[in-house]
Amino acid sequence: MARAVAGFGDWKRVGRRFNDLMKTFLWVALAIAAASAKLEGVSEAYPRTSPGDLELKTLPAARWMRTESSKDYFAGDNGLFMKLFRYIDSNKIPMTAPVEAGITPGTMVFYMDDASAKRADLAETPQVKLSSVPERRVAAIGIRGSYSRENYDEGLAELRAWLAKRTDVKAAGEPYAVYWNSPFVPFFFKQSEVHIPVVPTK
């Protein structure tokens, strides 16, 4: 009998631990959802290309914040995001979407919102450069899934094959990645794109 009572006590402790873990999980899930909603409610510089779609589209003229690294973009410690985040945080510039990334060498671009693009008080730093870019024409493929090199490479291969069959435009620059979602979004909801700059075929 004593052994049975002791066993029952063990199960009660396991049950309490399970309940505590579930409460912790729910709080973490709520915190992530709240942070995600806050970061997802940003202005977007141009329309998204839906996952699985391939298209030509025109990107509007814009004001950029850009930083670079000597490392490949997919190196885990390239530090690109934090350089730009510290700049917008210290200058009270709203976060926008998307984030654009060159691969080798690693580069990252944040877009300025319309109000920030008109500010005269913003200055470059050794790590963050500012520039105005004209309207651009790109070939684009939409991707759903994690922001991995594998997904980027697969999307790029499909986009290049699609572009090679066209007779109206040709590649005119290096491909780059386009990321739409915050880090808090689950990988199966994340949307990204690969772009290749294009010009009309003469």
Residue positions per predicted region:
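A solvent-exposed interaction/effector surface
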Residues: 11-202
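Extreme N-terminal basic, low-complexity initiation segments
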Residues: 2-7
